[in-house]
Amino acid sequence: MRRPFHTPPPVYDPARGLLHSDHFQIGYVTNDLDRAVDIFRTQFRIEKFRANDAEMPGGTKISTRTVWIGSTMYEIACGSGPGMEAFSKYAPPDGEFVLKLHHFGYLVPDEEAWQAMEREVARGGWQMYMSNDTPGYVKACFVEVPEIGHLVEFILPREMLIERFNATPVA
């Protein structure tokens, strides 16, 4: 179906404001990944997900399930252990079942735009979480934005993450 209205092209200018980047992802957080995936399968008829699971030293774990629905990537994330507070703060591993909106994901096209985003975060007085820069994979961070009630994630994808995104199933 073609949209019956004009959709502007993505904006890539975080220097204009924190949300002036290409919004491509909706992220959910959970403390029970199997149960959350089952909800997406039974309630929303999403059959296939790309699974990514990582365990690190010290008991840190992160698991995600991703799928493209139209031009939006949906992500369900479950993180626990040291360094995963950006997830466990919103879905405590030992708490009651949680599945809720966690973040909007924004693509950052290049290092210049990344630096503009960092300046905007500093200007706004927001807190940055889990900032990482993995050569060949991704430069990413979460920013806590209490004014809108959820985190925003900024992603500057590199070759390996681009391959992973391209291999993500389409619902």
Task: List each language-model region with its residue ranges.
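N-terminal strand-loop-strand beta-hairpin
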Residues: 3-6, 12, 22-27, 43-69, ...
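Amphipathic alpha-helical segments
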Residues: 32-48, 116-124
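Histidine- and/or cysteine-centered catalytic micro-motif in compact active-site loops
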Residues: 79-81, 109
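Short, structured motif recognition centered on aromatic/hydrophobic residues
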Residues: 23-27, 40, 74-77, 101-104, ...
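A cross-kingdom feature marking solvent-exposed beta-strand/loop segments within repeated
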Residues: 10-13, 46-62, 83-102, 124-129, ...
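Vicinal oxygen chelate
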Residues: 1-17, 23-31, 65-70, 75, 89-113, 116-171
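N-terminal beta-strand motif that seeds the catalytic metal site of vicinal oxygen chelate
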Residues: 2-37, 99-106, 166-171
